[in-house]
Amino acid sequence: MFLKLTLPPGLFRNGTAYQSAGRWYDANLVRFFEGQIRPMKGWDTGLTGTLSGTPRAAHAWKDNEGDSFAAFGTVTSLYAHDGTTLDDITPAAAVSILLEDGTDLDTEGSEALLQESGFDSGADSSTWTLDNFGELLVACNDHEQTIYEWQPRGGLDATAITNAPDAKAIFVTNERFIIALGADGDPRRVAWNDQENRTVWTATSTNQAGDLNLQTAGVAMCGGKVRSGGLIWTDTDLHLMRYQGFPDIYGIERVGNNCGIIGRHAFYIVDSVAYWMGQNGFWRYVGYVEPLACEISDDVFRNMNTTYRNKVWCQH
């Protein structure tokens, strides 16, 4: 006689296989839909062409004519895709990008060994942050640290934004400021340009450029926009950046402690709710920070190779 087994959706790995009796314990290439386990659909080629190096970031946006573009940052290059053609838009100047093994490669072919400290031992793997300022792509590599821009349809490579500071990461706010995190070599400095003027970064009494230092023991990692402002993650906590206008322009307050992010791409924002992977748990921001219950967290954090945690990617 056969008995029908009805197992709750999702995996349970917070304990041993014996402790997960009555639950799914292991799976691969499956999904849960309407409470039932289903196979993943097949893979389809998203674009033609070949990327040089492992992709570390992606961003999609539309230009002023409503046409879609996507950008991809790898450990060696920067690419743009217009729906048909994949273009290498890596800046023409020699761009040094630190690979995970510590080897520094530049576009002129020279090699050197660059010592940088990562989260643990060894070098922190190179990654990009990408956003759009209107129809312009804005890009920053956390090892090379120059802030670049790229004009769709321009036929040119990405170029450095004039007067912009060095940075570890960037994002664009709802008020159309480019935010530079870890600006000018200070891991806690947050700098922004004059509103709508991406080449003016020095504050005066007649513009809205400026900078602030995060009040934190951590270092700025990444940022993104929600309805209430811009969220800035460090490796120890979370901050909210609000537009105030003259004279301060922006104010920053800490909105979460001991909830720092594990990597620069370990978050996603949907409907102004932010979700992210922390150093030892999962979190979300809904106007306040709260932990997310996860039935596989023990397995994830126990077996993770933390040397490469900056490669963690969150997607929806």
Feature annotation, model-predicted:
Residues 1-111, 167-239:
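N-terminal beta-propeller domains
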Residues 52-63, 95-109, 115-132, 163-175, ...:
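Repeated scaffold domains used in trafficking and secretory/extracellular systems
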Residues 82-84, 151-154, 243-246, 288:
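Short loop/turn segments that connect beta-strands within beta-propeller blades
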Residues 43-49, 112-118, 156-162, 207-213, ...:
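A short beta-strand motif characteristic of beta-propeller blades
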Residues 87-96, 158-163, 203-205, 250-255, ...:
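Beta-propeller fold detector
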Residues 216-316:
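Beta-sheet-dominated scaffold domains
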Residues 132-161:
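Hydrophobic or amphipathic alpha-helical targeting/insertion segments
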Residues 77, 144-145, 184-186, 281-283:
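Short glycine/acidic-enriched loop and turn motifs that connect beta-strands
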